[in-house]
Amino acid sequence: MKTLQKDLTTGNPGKIIFNFTLPIFIGNVFQQFYSMADTIIVGKFVGTKALAAVGSTGTIMFLINGFILGMTAGFTVLTAQKFGAGDMKAMRKTVGNAAILAIIMSLIMTVLGMMAMKPLLGIMKTPDDIFKDAYAYIMVICGGIAAQMLYNFLSSVLRALGNSKVPLYFLILAALLNIVLDMVFIIAFHMGAAGAAWATVISQGISGILCLVYIVKAVPILHLHKEDWRPSGHLLKIQLAVGIPMALQYSITAIGTMMVQTALNLLGSTQVAAFTAANKIEQIVTQAYVAMGTTMATYCAQNIGAGKIKRIRQGFKSITIMGSIYSVVVAAIIMTVGKYMTYLFLSGDLTEIMHSVDIYLKCVGTFFIPLTVVNVYRNGIQGMGYGLLPMMAGVAELVGRGVVAMIAAGQKSYFGVCMASPAAWILASALLIVMYYYVIHQNEKRFAKYADEG
């Protein structure tokens, strides 16, 4: 069988980065279909208030998903570094230890999440007319955290080895299954918002199981031995030192988005529904930035393991150009015709809602280039083994998003709510560019010293 694992330390950086990013982007878009299918079917067949209920939990969903994504990606940075260095024995050991951490964290997150949801929705001032549906939806999601952890961990392991295609295949299948289950649970069984959550959890679980079956059947270098499951204090310390800051970084961002959601909730369920629809449109086009970030984490991890700092510089240059071109194109599209996608989510007279959707898309589309920098540089720095520095950029995001959200809440300004994320991107991108040059300079000196000693 032809191996799908890929060494990212050789070949043309731009071409390799593009080829690795494309399947991740497609996979991320299909993953968005999980929530988009929920949004469309809930909005069309249950109603505006049910759509607002699902949308009002979006920031909590981001907190859960982001924490899992950041943590599993961080746990497997060391895996990519060992793979890049050609040390397969050490690579397997990192996978075994990361799996132990993932299991423990999924249990902790499930218990804490289910305990915290009701008070958290209250703190966020979720409107009374959508509270019941919002609570039902998010509790099912919390109960399915293990399913999310399974897929994200195994896909992170495969990507650490340069395989971005297989997670895509299983994700596409799961996304299609999610749509079918949405129709069954919501339309046929009339389960409402909770039915949408069940469809999402079941689909994610199946995607994770398929990844596991693939690894067992087709990736012999990931067949773990008994000794690989033995906890190593040294490895666990390194993995936690990268994984926890990456997870917390998403959490910090999520706290900022919760502040935005709180400000939005003060404007009523109609504006919440408009913001939800617009945010879904934004999330589809911005998955390219998430994919670029995922690519750079693996690319930088493998190349730092191989000691190729110049190649890392070349990679950053190539992907920054790609991201900037993409930003200009998609911004032009969503700022002109994006509002018409509102018809995907809602029916009836949408004049007021479409106007609000248009405001949101124009606000965020104007600042897509800073968003490119945030995703690419943050993940690349993390891939080189730095956990705390990118987290500081997350704090900058929190400050930018939080300050604007508080001002918007005080003035009950929808435009202010829409400008919260752009403010966060501008602050974080400026800080990350400075961090990038610092990290590159430090590693150039480090590897030059090793060369001199050799």
Locations of the language-model features?
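Hydrophobic transmembrane alpha-helices of multi-pass small-molecule transporters
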Residues: 63-66, 110, 178-182, 208-212, ...
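Helix-terminus/linker motif at the lipid-water interface of multi-pass membrane proteins
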Residues: 33-51, 121-128, 184-191, 251-284, ...
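Transmembrane helical elements of multi-pass membrane transporters/channels
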Residues: 19-38, 140, 151, 174, ...
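Short alpha-helical transmembrane segments in multi-pass integral membrane proteins
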Residues: 1-21, 79-144, 188-244, 300-367, ...
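N-terminal transmembrane alpha-helices
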Residues: 8-46, 59-74, 78, 103-110, ...
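Short runs within selected transmembrane alpha-helices of multi-pass transporters and secretion channels
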Residues: 72, 141-159, 167-175, 196-211, ...
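Hydrophobic residues within alpha-helical transmembrane segments
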Residues: 22, 26, 57-60, 100, ...
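Small-residue-rich hydrophobic transmembrane alpha-helices
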Residues: 51-111, 148-167, 274-338, 371-393
